[in-house]
Amino acid sequence: ILCPQMSPFHFGILQAAFNTCGYHLEVLPNDNKHAVDVGLKYVNNDACYPSLMVVGQVMDALLSGKYDLNKTAVIMSQTGGGCRASNYIAFIRRALKKTGMEQVPVISTNLSGLESNPGFKLTLPLIKRVCYGAVFGDILMKCVYRMRPYEVEEGIVNRKHKIWEQRVISFLTGSSVSHSQFKKMCHEMVHEFDMIPITGEKKPRVGIVGEILVKFLPAANNHLAELLEAEGAEAVCPDLIDFINYCFYNQNFKCEFLGFKKNKATIANWGIKAIEWLRKPMNEALAQSRHFTPSANIADLAKMAEPIVSPGNQTGEGWFLTGEMME
């Protein structure tokens, strides 16, 4: 199963989670300019940049001759909103049709019931590992961006990142993935980064806010975090899990003003509660540290955005971007 790259901090970890649960997932390493050029052959150039990047990655891989097309599938997340995140699947299928590769199935991972996928099931062990992996990815991203601009010993933060990434992968690929061990690792990870010797200087902090793929994928934002660090600033990037909370939180407005069934909001709010419970060890560890701050609450982000833009402004991550800017 081929998966386009979106966030290097998270997707290597998530690949291990999928592979432990009986799938052979490969996160594509071809997130580069060539992938964009390939994407332009199959997606009209008035489609957004992320869709060119993703379709390009998929088609570049399938056309490479490396994979047996009769034993290969493509996986893509689908949010169910009005934006390209719902239309990727159609973009990819159209590109496959144009090149005579219609036998390659495109798997949609969605919670909105947009598509069902025979042969692909989100099981409890897989969901558990993916959730833990996403939290670990967020911690690593926070810690690396916060500490790297100030490190006394050059390269120590990146080395620490690689060590912890391997520890996380070993944990997620083990036979027993316990919540107590997850909590312990959250605290240990934050503590180890917190203890890295840093210079006492104060640099400008620059928030990176934008569409999800452009925000998290260095190849899509011209390696913005590295550029900011080279120019003497500290990059701050919001959590990936916040986006999932945003998708859940939107159901409240839809039920109140757009005639959606009330139980949708109830289920979504339970989803937010579950995510906050899952993130609790991370936020506790961050709150106890010297250099890090806990993650924002999605309801607080919505309140911050409300004086500027309505929570009904949801397509293209509408009010969420404003909330992140304010936060």
PLM region spans:
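An N-terminal assembly and electron-transfer interface module characteristic of large anaerobic redox
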Residues: 1-327
